[in-house]
Amino acid sequence: METPFYKQIWFLGGIATLAIFALCFLAINMVGSPDDDDRPKVEMEVIATLQTNEPLMMIAREQGWIDADATEMTSVDAAEVDSIGTIFSGCNLKTFNEFRYFVGLKQITTEAFAHADQLTAITIPSQVVDIAYGAFADCPALETISVDTANTHYDSRDNCNGIICTWKGTLMLVAGCKNTTLSDRIGYIAPQAFRGCKGLTAITFPERMEEIGDSAFMDCSALKEVSVPQGVRFVEPATFMGCKSLQTVTLTKSVERLQKNAFKGCTSLSKIVCPKKYPPIIDEAFDSYDVTVYVPAGLQNKYFSDKFWKFFKDVKESE
């Protein structure tokens, strides 16, 4: 059996040495270890958007964020919160830039703010290191998204009005809104990044984007036209599902497969442009084939005879 630490100490100086040892032990505990809470200190400030929202104040009391009889929540209270779960899902907040005071928060979970249909603006706190896919799904009024500039894992560079993951190598847009702009440096769009963004009418992709995640633009009901960027090989499941205003889809030569439900519920779709010599595979991507397909000169018969593309209303050769 290993000798306990306290029995290995030789108190050669008697009581004096014991006293010195005790003081050293106390000093070590006062300094603390490197694992101590590293959340930044915040100045006391009332979070007005919560103070005037009694349903959320009730939740704050129930969660123990504030005392049971408290009538306000401050930035100091918010700094002690380390988990929000889906408490704000479906909330009636209009703006929540004071969310930045939740500096103890490390993770924003799936659907954390989903279905908050009045939310127009939010700022992500500095200490968040993990934002789940779909955290802001179905927030149709959202028009301003920013990240605290002290955050080392996410940012909103170039005033993009979105959340960009910066720590996984290639830049990935995790969440966007109707005013999001995509810089040429973004290589990925995360699953559900724009899901339910009903105010989005157009989107311009970087030319060399590599991947658009599943359900990324699901239920973007005002989106009218899409040009899939060069570099994307698969149109993932449900990517544009429920885009009821989508009229024209332009594919590129890099597209190999249209996955299940990719364009399901696109009731206005009337035109697909496909420049590939060999028709891409279609895996139940459409629920209607009342669409005219435009292909390069000399390929009409190839598409008409293809087991996937022969079901479309018409195939025409581009001039």
Please describe what each predicted stretch is:
Residues 284-285, 301-312:
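Short, aromatic/basic amphipathic alpha-helical patches
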Residues 37-55:
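N-terminal low-complexity, Pro/Thr/Ser-rich intrinsically disordered segments
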Residues 17-25:
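Alpha-helical transmembrane segments
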Residues 24-37:
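Hydrophobic single-pass membrane-insertion segments
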Residues 51-65:
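Short, non-transmembrane alpha-helical segments in secretory-pathway proteins
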Residues 109-112, 133-135, 190-193, 213-216, ...:
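Consensus positions within tandem repeat domains that build extended binding/scaffold surfaces
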Residues 46-51, 67-82, 91-107, 116-130, ...:
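Structural signature of tandem-repeat unit edges
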